[in-house]
Every structure is written in C-alpha cells, then in structure tokens.
UniProtKB/Swiss-Prot annotation:
This is Copine-4. Residues 305-507 form the VWFA domain. The keyword Signal does not apply. CDD domains: C2A_Copine (cd04048), C2B_Copine (cd04047), vWA_copine_like (cd01459).
Length: 557
C-alpha cells in the first residue's frame, strides 16, 4: 500500500497554488444530529469549523455560529467556497463544543469531524456522514452538508417589439424607425443594451425579436429603470428623435404568456410646447420569454454522472516493461508517467461517479490467449465487464496485465473512441442529462490512424462525450495538436467540422517538474464548459427541477 499512497500523494499534494478563474461559488449549509458531550448531564454548545487542505496542511476557512445547549443543531451561517471541477478540494468539518466563556479552540472540546471533497458534496448535493473522533465514530452523531450553487443570473430574455402610429419625420416618405434600449446605471450613466434593425418607410414597424442576457438588460435587478428611445434613421448619421419611454424588466415581464405591454412614445419638447399633444406613437411589447441558461453544477446537482474511461497505450515503442528505461516500468516506490497521469485525472473524475466503477482498456498489444493484436481490450481481460473498482482498481489491473501482454503496435486510437462513443450514443436515447462520458487516452507516440481518429472525433462531438489525450514520454507530439481544436476547427477527412471542441491534448513532459495536480487542472478545466455546451445545445435541462432544489434545503440529516 506504500506504493499506492505515494501515487496518491504525488497526484494531489499541491492545491491552491494556481490562479485559474473560479468556475462558480458554492454555498454549503450544515446541520448535525445526535451530538454527544463528554458531560452526559449537559448538552454541548456546538460550532462547526470548515477547514480546507492546501500544500498538505489544513487551514480554517470559516466557522458557524455557536448554538447553545443543542444536540441537533441546524446552522444559519452558510459557508461560501470557490468550486473548481479540475481540482481535488479536500474539506474537513470539525464540530467543537465552545464554552460560553471562550471562543478559542484550546478551551473547546472536539466532538467529531468529517473529511470529504467538495466534488463529493456537489455531486450528491446532500452528503450525510458519521462524525469521527480519533478515527472512530463519535457515538451516533452525524453531520449533513448541502450544496447550492451561488451564481449570477445567467438567464437571457427574448423580446419582440412593434410600434403603431409613430410620428412622420420625413418629407417625401415615412419615417425609418429603430429602437434603442438603455440600462440606467447606479452612477446615473446609461449603457446601451440593444439596438434594433431599421424598418424602412413604416410608421407601424414590427422589429425582429432579439435575445439579451438578464445581467446585460438590468444587472439582475428587475426594478432597474430602462430608457427606450425611438429614432428615425438618416443616412447621414444624424438620426431624428421620435420619442421615448421608460420601463423596467419587471414591467416587461407582463408580456409573458401571450399578453402585451404598451407604452406611449413621448417627445418631451412636443409635450411642453403643444397643448393638445398626446404622444408620438405607441410602442408595444408582444413577447417576453425568459430562457434559463443552466450551469455545470445545475447538471451535476441534477444527478448527471461523469462516466470516466481510461485507455492505455501498450505499443512496443514504450519499451520492455522489465527494463527500467521503459515508460511502463513499475518502480517499487515511484509511479511511472502513465500512473501519475491516470491517478491525477481519475481521482477528480471519480467524485462525480456514484458507483466508482471505471472501464479500463488497452490498445496496441498482443493479448492472450491467441496473442492477436487488439486496440480496445479490457486490461482486466474481462471483455464482458471491463470495469475496475475505483482508480486503485484501474492501477492494480494495469500492473497485473503488463506481464501478460506482448507490446506491439500500431498506435490506433479510433477503435477506443468509437467504443466509448457507442455507449454515449446509447445515452442520447434517454433525452436526459444522465451520463456524460470522459475518455482519457494515455499514449507515448503520434497516432497512426489519424484519418479514422478525426472521423471518430467529429462523430463524438455530437454526443455527451469529451476526449483527453496525454502524451507520455519524449516523442514529438506536434502532429497531435491538430486534434485539439484550440488552434483551428478539426475536420473529418470528408471535410465535416466538429460540432464542438471536445478534445484536449497535453504532453506530460510539460508537467514533469510540477505536481500532477497541475496536469489535471490543464486537461480538465474545459470539461464543465463542454458539458454545458452539449446539454444546452441540445435543449436538455437538468433532471432535477427547481422544486427539488427547494426541497433540498431541508437540513434534517
């Protein structure tokens, strides 16, 4: 087990040293049940302290209020933490009995603790575990932590305006009206939110519907004032003012469900000068639709599972595993690059898979008993059930299969992409956000079936699937960069472009002198966006409804 512990330590021993942008913030609600005090005659005054691990050390992040004489506390204090999918964020919840005379921990009694990762909490949305004290359960006491995403309003709104009987500003034709909408900021400035197209020669125009984010429209404040101005377009750029009105997003929402909202378009100068002035026309909002933009955590908390699959290169270019120069050499204490990459990425993905069973395949080797070449064999040699129990199970299957293989070639990865794509394709039949597939391919050389691989990736880009390729060793991987769509659009040999960028390629040597956690951050940082892009693009909502979210706030353990 010393070997495994070294692998895990090297995979996650440097957290918090990177400055990547935070994906989102998460609120954690805490409750405890059945807390027991050392003094059986009195009830404790419990407080929960949240600690986070960084560089192998635990640091206090925040603490709840103290609830006096209570064995089943439900805390009102929320913990707010930054969430990074691409990191293992280790948390420790400690329950202390805080004396009424002291707030320091030296005088407090430690009542129990619980360790987990933030990924485990958000993937389950409600995590309940027994409190442990010195490695043993602290009586029947337990702690429950509920996660809720704290994010800005990412929804967008679709609006459709028309006007009626606008003032005519042209001598030889009718006005050419367009509409501008401005957000009134707190500092009294105005921010243009949208400008419609010009409708030529028409006093009762119907402008095309348009979409704008709620944040852009009103900064998330439905009562923020909006100024709407109607202009008569002129080719010289000196547009004529027709009229204006003010509204709010709250008022505009009155045009939902087939209703209309209308405003008088007023020219203040005309209103001041003309006694019989009524208005310069009417502006009507015919449609107000609010479109929900779901986040990565919406899908994860809604029950979407990350299905993690690994594929390992067993071609002869890796070298004889019995030789210490081989990329597959099993050192008694130092994990090889294949193991480092596998554990670094797999340790993060496993938090989002409830059964912790991971299919693991190999390619490029001759396998027993006939020793024919295979490019998608199960490394546990059980083709009917290629799954391994946890990342440790994958590591053990890898170490066990090495002596039984004949490393061969070529380096073909299209078959393994197609195998996982088949499972992802079956998932699309559910029409739900149930499973998203991540395929980790570990290879030591440039692939030899580039055309077939491009075809497979283009097909997979239409499925709930992402592909991560890690180049192991010192080969020239420059040709592999074309699979990563960052520098351009990947196309199949027939010219069909990928629907979305699903491939991330990195050479392991770029992280040789950094923690494997840095490798995981690099290859997994784009996964949340890829998940959201797929499901939002398909119009698939998270399985969990808003009502379930509300009910999840019930903190009874």
């Amino acid at each position: 087990m010393k070997k495994m512990s070294n692998i895990y330590e090297s995979a996650a021993n440097t957290l918090g040293i990177f400055n990547s942008p935070c994906l989102t913030k998460v609120e954690l609600r805490v409750a405890c049940k059945g807390i027991s005090d050392r003094d059986a005659l009195s009830k404790p005054d419990p407080c929960v302290i949240l600690k986070m691990q960084s560089h192998g050390q635990w640091f206090e992040v925040d603490r709840t209020e103290v609830i006096r004489t209570c064995i089943n506390p439900v805390y009102s204090k929320l913990f707010t933490v930054d969430f990074y999918f691409e990191e293992v964020q280790r948390l420790r919840f400690e329950v202390h009995d805080i004396s009424s005379n002291h707030n320091g921990l030296k005088e407090a009694d430690f009542l129990g603790g619980m360790e987990c990762t933030l990924g485990q909490i958000v993937s389950q949305r409600k995590l309940s575990k027994s409190l442990l004290k010195h490695g043993n359960t602290a009586g029947k006491s337990s702690i429950t932590v509920i996660a809720e995403e704290l994010s800005g309003n990412d929804d967008y709104v679709e609006l459709a305006f028309n006007a009626r009987k606008l003032d005519d500003k042209d001598f030889f034709s009718k006005s050419d009206p367009f509409l501008e909408i401005f957000r009134m900021n707190d500092d009294a400035t105005q921010q243009l939110v949208h400008r419609t197209e010009v409708v030529m020669n028409n006093l009762s125009p119907a402008w095309k519907s348009f979409k704008v984010s709620v944040n852009s429209l009103c900064s998330g404040d439905p009562d923020r004032r909006l100024k709407c101005i109607v202009w008569d377009w002129d080719s010289n750029g000196k547009h004529d003012f027709i009229g204006e009105f003010t509204s709010t997003f709250k008022e505009m929402r009155g045009a939902m469900e087939g209703k209309q909202v209308q405003w008088e378009c007023i020219n203040p100068k005309y209103k001041a000068k003309k006694k019989n002035y009524k208005n310069s026309g009417m502006v009507i909002l015919n449609q107000c639709k609010i479109h929900k933009m779901h986040s990565f955590l919406d899908y994860i908390m809604g029950g979407c599972q990350i299905q993690f699959t690994v594929a390992i290169d067993f071609t002869a270019s890796n070298g004889d595993p019995r030789n210490s120069c081989s990329l597959h050499y099993i050192h008694p204490y130092q994990p090889n690059e294949y193991l480092k990459a596998l554990v670094a990425v797999g340790e993060i993905c496993q938090d989002y898979d409830s059964d912790k069973m991971f299919p693991a395949f190999g390619f490029g080797a001759r396998i027993p008993p006939e020793y024919t070449v295979s490019h998608d064999f199960a490394i546990n040699f059980n083709e009917d059930n290629p799954e391994c129990a946890g990342i440790q199970g994958v590591v053990e299957a890898y170490q066990s299969c090495l002596p039984k293989l004949q490393l061969y070639g070529p380096t073909n990865i299209a078959p393994i992409i197609q195998k996982v794509a088949k499972s992802a394709s079956e998932e699309t039949n559910t029409k739900e956000a149930s499973q998203y597939f991540i395929l980790l391919i570990l290879t030591d050389g440039v692939i030899t079936d580039m055309a077939d691989t491009r075809e497979a990736i283009v097909h997979a880009s239409h499925l709930p699937m992402s592909v991560i390729i890690v180049g192991v060793g010192n080969a020239d991987f420059s040709d592999m960069q074309m699979l990563d769509g960052d520098d351009g659009i990947l196309r199949s040999p027939k010219g069909e472009p990928v629907l979305r960028d699903i491939v991330q390629f990195v050479p392991f040597r770029n992280f040789k002198h950094a923690s494997p956690a840095a490798l995981a951050k690099s290859v997994l940082a784009e996964v949340p966006n890829q998940v959201v892009d797929y499901y939002n693009g398909k119009g698939i909502k998270p399985k969990c409804s808003s009502e379930v979210y509300e009910s999840s706030r019930t903190l009874a353990p």
